[in-house]
Amino acid sequence: MSTLNTRERTGAGLAGGSVLLVGGSVAASSMLTGYPVLGGQAVRYLAAGLLLAAWARLTHKPLPRPTGPEWAWLAGLAVIGLAGCSVLMIQATRVADPASVGVIIGAAPLVIIIAAAIAARRLPAGRVLLAAAVVTAGSAASQLGGATGPAFSAAGLAWSAGALAGAVGTSLLAAPLLPRLGALAVTVYACGLAGLLLLAAAAIARTAGGPPILAIPTPAQLAALAYLTVAVTAVVFIAWYGAMERLGVDRTGLFNGLIPITSLAAVALTGTGTITPLGLLAALAVLAGVILGLGRHRKSLPAPGRGHELSSASSTWMVRRDGNLPDSVMVSNSQ
């Protein structure tokens, strides 16, 4: 196994930092149980998009204008990966304990690698597939090792599976956009679209007798919304997409398995739970799987290079100038 080069080490650092921030979102989300879901998530994404757009303007970072087909991909990313995934995740935690949700979401590394391989019409790299299986098993074991263990229910399983599908959709739908638009532009446009969609949905729900679109947040809710907006949305999306550009789908996706581990650590640090011996062993297994998958190998799905072009909204993969198909996609948790 070869050592990582500078570019790959940067990608690993970006992915690892993203996981730490997302792990902290569990505590933040628990503070929003009494806050309007659709309106709150709309504010989160709109604010994140505006903050990043302002930052791009101040730093003179270009935001390329999307083409028609790219707008279609961005709309799908906003609906499925951002708005859909976040709302489904919240609904899952309302009807199921975090452990059971974590078991399902922990399968993300394995699902994304298999999905990417199927879409690219090739077999996944053997070592990365093995690493993904180790990460998935360790992630599930970390939840099984909790104080109470997961309590599965039909509703909880359905919501969790939907959230997992949304997370995988985030990867598959973002991949064709990154080479030309870049991580910053993709995040700005997708957050803006997701925020507008959620705001419209909140307004429709309100006219149908649903909850208010927004409410005056308590100090704790305001802090939670700020953390989710800045750290878990604006920072995480750019960092994760940057990691994917450097590591590729298979190796970046492995870091998703660390999210339940960081969540358990956050719970232990805040004194709201404990880590059992099984949970600790599971954490070590996940770490071993990530290290195994990070090693270079010939059959790794490559990160996208410049020179790709998106020919139509129905094209799942972009073709490089040399005629080869890039297979790089990623999965992001947008809790």
PLM features: what roles do these ranges have?
Residues 52, 115, 124-146, 257-258, ...:
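Hydrophobic transmembrane alpha-helices of multi-pass small-molecule transport proteins
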Residues 27-35, 94, 143-154, 205-220, ...:
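Membrane-interface helix termini and inter-helical loops of multi-pass transporters
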Residues 15-19, 42-43, 82, 86, ...:
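Helix-helix packing/entry segments at the starts of transmembrane helices
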Residues 9-14, 39-55, 76, 130-137, ...:
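Hydrophobic alpha-helical transmembrane segments of multi-pass integral membrane proteins
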Residues 39-50, 81, 89-123, 127, ...:
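Specific alpha-helical transmembrane segments that line the substrate/conduction pathway
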Residues 1-43, 48-50, 87, 91, ...:
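Glycine-/small-residue-enriched transmembrane alpha-helix faces in small-molecule transporters
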Residues 32, 40, 44, 92, ...:
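Hydrophobic/aromatic residues within transmembrane alpha-helices
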Residues 21-26, 53-105, 141, 229-247:
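Specific transmembrane alpha-helical segments of multi-pass solute transporters/efflux pumps
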